[in-house]
Design a protein with these regions (language model features):
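Phosphate- and other anionic-substrate recognition elements at nucleic-acid/protein interfaces
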Residues: 2-23, 30, 35-156
């Protein structure tokens, strides 16, 4: 049976290198938002939005980003329901993480992203008044919001 490199957030902390960058992923239905953090794991920055294509294409794009940015760990948003239960979206994110872990060897963790889309929307709306620009930035801003939550936790 395949052993996945998916860890709890506390296990993740012990499996990532100090002074390394992380990749935040917000796996949506149509798009996948990406964000990265600095080597000190203090600030997350929106990176880009990938179209949800064939999984092989996504893996190739994500591997390229990992290589170019010297990424040493991945934080994937887990859309847990407000009551703490896992729904369809959470199961989809878990499946995405498992499939990703079969193709990528760096540590992966899932991070509770409750309210990240709402927070991302408010942040994007404040920063950009152009509606079409907001739509394009929402997914990568959500990934940055998710990653920031995780790195804030990791720094404590």
């Amino acid at each position: 049976m395949k052993t996945y490199n998916i860890f709890s957030i506390d296990e993740f902390k012990t499996n990532i290198e100090n002074n390394s960058r992380l990749l935040g992923i917000d796996p949506g239905k149509r798009n996948i938002g990406l964000a990265i953090c600095d080597e000190n794991k203090k600030v997350s920055t929106p990176l880009k939005v990938l179209q949800k294509n064939k999984f092989e294409v996504l893996i190739k794009e994500i591997n390229q980003i990992i290589k170019e940015n010297h990424i040493k760990g991945i934080v994937i948003g887990n859309p847990i329901n407000m009551d703490g239960t896992s729904g369809k979206s959470s199961q989809s994110a878990s499946d995405f993480a498992k499939n990703l872990s079969k193709n990528i060897t760096i540590p992966i963790t899932m991070w509770d992203e409750r309210l990240s889309s709402e927070g991302s929307f408010k942040m994007t709306k404040q920063l950009d008044t152009n509606v079409s620009n907001r739509v394009n930035k929402l997914d990568k801003n959500a990934a940055a919001f998710i990653l920031q939550g995780a790195i804030d936790y990791l720094s404590n």
